[in-house]
């Protein structure tokens, strides 16, 4: 088992950890980025920080050498999503995502919008079932499937539309690799080092467990960003992952 640099898009690191920058102010996020070596992780910018600080915030972090996962989960009519995904590509982000529940026409339009970017296109992934959701949440929405069943259904749809992978729970990873293939990328939130608080994630795994399950990229936020020593915490996580990879 080994992590190779992703050949699907330009990248400055082979590290599987994506740190979620869930800060309320820009200075704290930039201060954190100053502590971290861009070769040790990628950074995720979500809706709150992008709405507050805009595209220039993405550019600032890129200028420090970081690959950016722009986690905006686009979900709209096909043309609107296609244009939004193309705008993200113009920013030079490493990865951008959409909601698979937007359907095949929307996902195909998003993929097509990246054609002109060629090898410079970002990875395009789809969100399946949010890791904060459980059976009761799906039932409330009129979906009579388990989270795992619904996630698999959406993952297969995303693959059929030509997307590079999905954002999913680590608990679905082993099954998704079986049905979607090893080249289909799996990005997993809900990753918590042993001893961390679960927070608002309901389906969680440790980094070591995620690697064994077949995860390609793992999103970790508060256990790193709110640690007393974020740099040391990130280094410990990377060491633990490398230990599994070397002995896997």
From Swiss-Prot:
**EC main group:** lyase
What is its pathway?
Answer: Pyrimidine metabolism; UMP biosynthesis via de novo pathway; UMP from orotate: step 2/2
* Parts of the chain that traverse the membrane: none
Q: List the disulfide bonds.
A: none
**Keywords of this protein's UniProt record, alphabetized?**
Decarboxylase, Lyase, Pyrimidine biosynthesis
Active-site residues, Swiss-Prot/TrEMBL = 73
Q: Which reaction does it catalyse?
A: orotidine 5'-phosphate + H(+) = UMP + CO2
**UniProt key word Acetylation:** no
Alphabetized Pfam families for the sequence: OMPdecase
Q: What Gene Ontology terms describe where this protein resides (cellular component)?
A: cytosol
Question: How does this protein assemble?
Answer: Homodimer.
- NCBIfam families for the chain: PRK00230.1 (NF001273), pyrF (TIGR01740)
Q: Which family does it belong to?
A: Belongs to the OMP decarboxylase family. Type 1 subfamily.
Protein's name in the database: Orotidine 5'-phosphate decarboxylase
What is the species of this protein? Answer: Proteus mirabilis (strain HI4320)
Name the gene for this chain.
pyrF
